[in-house]
């Protein structure tokens, strides 16, 4: 039985994971951490868990990494809004621990990322823009998924990523991201490939949080026999 510690247990993703965990017979929630806990409670979270699924905040993640290293606890990180310093911490810790990070753990979003990569190779001279939409209470913008998609495309076309372009005219050497917030939208991401004669659109829409939660739990199971490294969902789905 795999003991999964859940960081961010009272958030939307944490609640969804708790709701569906019984679908997986080879794992259980061993310990929970949420915003009412003291950060030092992360010590017990890591001590009593084989792997942590983290959907918390960047501030919590920094402490979590330290305790995970102390107890040799594997990490599945789905927290978004991370900065360069957080990724440096993950890369350093991954020399000692198996860690999986993804801004979106659903198979659909990762398939979209693959399709974006392959489409970009074919539509080399097209302009590219990304539109993402989420519920009114989402704290970060643009979304981590939008940044993942933009990074994939920008890496192929050698483009700069722009958010909130304002009054400036679009440069040929950039990919723009636009964000909408409202209602109870779980997540919509659209990629537009545009030229003078046609527009090609790739789209993924999450109907609820279940696909993200399933991906996170599958990641925790997959990580059990893996050596120390920083992994992504592409390593699981082979896309």
UniProtKB/Swiss-Prot annotation:
It catalyses: (S)-2,3,4,5-tetrahydrodipicolinate + NAD(+) + H2O = (2S,4S)-4-hydroxy-2,3,4,5-tetrahydrodipicolinate + NADH + H(+); (S)-2,3,4,5-tetrahydrodipicolinate + NADP(+) + H2O = (2S,4S)-4-hydroxy-2,3,4,5-tetrahydrodipicolinate + NADPH + H(+). Its EC number is 1.17.1.8. Its main location: cytoplasm. One of its GO terms (biological process) is diaminopimelate biosynthetic process. It is found in: Cytoplasm. Keywords: Amino-acid biosynthesis, Cytoplasm, Diaminopimelate biosynthesis, Lysine biosynthesis, NAD, NADP, Oxidoreductase. Belongs to the DapB family. HAMAP family: DapB (MF_00102). Catalyzes the conversion of 4-hydroxy-tetrahydrodipicolinate (HTPA) to tetrahydrodipicolinate. This is 4-hydroxy-tetrahydrodipicolinate reductase. The lineage of its organism: Bacteria, Pseudomonadati, Pseudomonadota, Alphaproteobacteria, Rickettsiales. The gene is dapB.
């Amino acid at each position: 039985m795999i003991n999964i510690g859940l960081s961010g247990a009272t958030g939307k993703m944490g609640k969804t994971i708790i709701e569906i965990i019984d679908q997986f017979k080879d794992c259980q929630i061993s310990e929970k951490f949420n915003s009412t806990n003291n950060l030092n409670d992360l010590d017990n979270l890591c001590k009593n868990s084989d792997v942590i699924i983290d959907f918390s905040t960047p501030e919590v993640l920094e402490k979590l990494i330290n305790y995970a290293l102390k107890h040799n606890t594997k990490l599945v990180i789905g927290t978004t809004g991370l900065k360069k310093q957080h990724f440096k911490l993950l890369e350093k810790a991954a020399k000692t621990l198996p860690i999986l990070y993804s801004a979106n753990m659903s198979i659909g979003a990762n398939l979209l990322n693959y399709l974006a990569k392959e489409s970009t190779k074919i539509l080399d001279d097209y302009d590219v823009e990304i539109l993402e939409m989420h519920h009114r209470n989402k704290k970060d913008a643009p979304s981590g998924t939008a940044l993942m998609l933009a990074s994939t495309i920008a890496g192929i076309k050698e483009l700069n990523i722009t958010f909130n372009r304002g009054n400036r005219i679009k440069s040929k050497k950039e990919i723009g991201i636009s964000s909408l917030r409202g209602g109870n939208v779980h997540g919509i991401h659209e990629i537009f490939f545009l030229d003078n004669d046609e527009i090609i659109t790739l789209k993924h829409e999450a109907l609820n949080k279940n696909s993200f939660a399933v991906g996170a739990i599958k990641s925790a199971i997959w990580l059990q026999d893996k050596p120390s490294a920083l992994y992504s969902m592409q390593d699981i789905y082979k896309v």
